[in-house]
Swiss-Prot record:
Belongs to the eIF-3 subunit M family. Keywords: Cytoplasm, Initiation factor, Protein biosynthesis. The keyword Cytoplasm applies. This is Eukaryotic translation initiation factor 3 subunit M. Component of the eukaryotic translation initiation factor 3 (eIF-3) complex, which is involved in protein synthesis of a specialized repertoire of mRNAs and, together with other initiation factors, stimulates binding of mRNA and methionyl-tRNAi to the 40S ribosome. The eIF-3 complex specifically targets and initiates translation of a subset of mRNAs involved in cell proliferation. InterPro entries: ARM-type_fold, COPS7/eIF3m, eIF3m, eIF3m_C_helix, PCI_dom. PANTHER family: COP9 SIGNALOSOME COMPLEX SUBUNIT 7/DENDRITIC CELL PROTEIN GA17, EUKARYOTIC TRANSLATION INITIATION FACTOR 3 SUBUNIT M. It is found in: Cytoplasm. GO terms for molecular function: translation initiation factor activity. Residues 181-343 form the PCI domain. One of its GO terms (cellular component) is eukaryotic translation initiation factor 3 complex, eIF3m.
Amino acid sequence: MQGPAVFIDAEIDDQAQELRKFFKSLGAEISEEKSSKGIEDDLHKIIGVCDVCFKDGTQHTLEEIDAVLNSVVSIIVSIPLERGENLILAFCEKMTRAPDSNLARVCLQSLWRLFSNLEPTSPLRYHVYYHLVQVAKRADQVKEVFSGVDQLKSQFSQCPPSNEQMQKLYRLLHDVLKDTNSELASKVMIELLGTYTAENASYAREDAMKCIVTALADPNTFLLDPLLSLKPVRFLEGELIHDLLSVFVSEKLPSYLQFYKNHKEFVNSQGLNHEQNIKKMRLLSFMQLAESNPEMTFQQLQDELQIGENEVEPFIIEVLKTKLVRARMDQKARKVHISSTMHRTFGRPQWQQLRDLLHAWKANLTLVQENMKSVSEAQIELAHKQ
């Protein structure tokens, strides 16, 4: 998201007085006269009433409101940062009061201008960005201010927020993303859990549970094994949520169905959809079967995945769409031929398998190199004889 540079062709004092008059005309309790205490007091009073332009009945367009807020921002950025912190925080809080999405978009632009005009080394950028995310949610523009964790970190590279501040921001991002982008919300929660250390991981119980639930609910997250290594998740061992995660990490469909039968109320209380869970477990079970079965019959899939005869082909097509498995379907022979599959877990056996594969490639390449060398030498020798 890009905001225009802040520049108003008027003296700061004159701007402040015009803003006072404008807000007073809208019914705000503010004097039209400039403060004898200086521009900072003027700005304090202006920010205190600037949300009056959000009220119903104002005869001003969104463009006019945007211009007024831009004028406020232009004064804010002219104040030295060491004296402007409270003013910036107060303005940010006012921008979160936009009553509808259209006004929220105007406020989002104003906050983005403010954020863009702060020095990259300013710690206030964090506070402005936090409010940016809040307003972006109301404006349905979250993707404009957050595209991923790497982008987020780069924005604060010259003045990294504290660990506690990042935890607060990650929680907010998860909250605004969970209903519209579950995959990104899951990544944010995993990043959040990564901020905890062995010393404070026990305090991350709620975050860890949210992370697990978000990952399980995300239809595009299938590699769940890394969650088990996160310290806050380890502290949940022995609890139902950890048991459920373990089922999704390494068990097959029957194990999930048994878990649901025994703990139906718990699963539902976490906001998880049973039918979606079954769909995901079928995909995960297929992946696990594909690891050790280069060829599977349709009947085998019916039995293992508990699906009807007419559901097998549509299911295989859905699996192939995920690109988790590369396979070829032989409809005539009613078989599936597996080329490759993503492993559900990647532990020591998988590393050993990868090591063996790389060694085999190395040996084959060495053999090819030696054969090519022999052919080359033979050709040279033949050329000399001729």
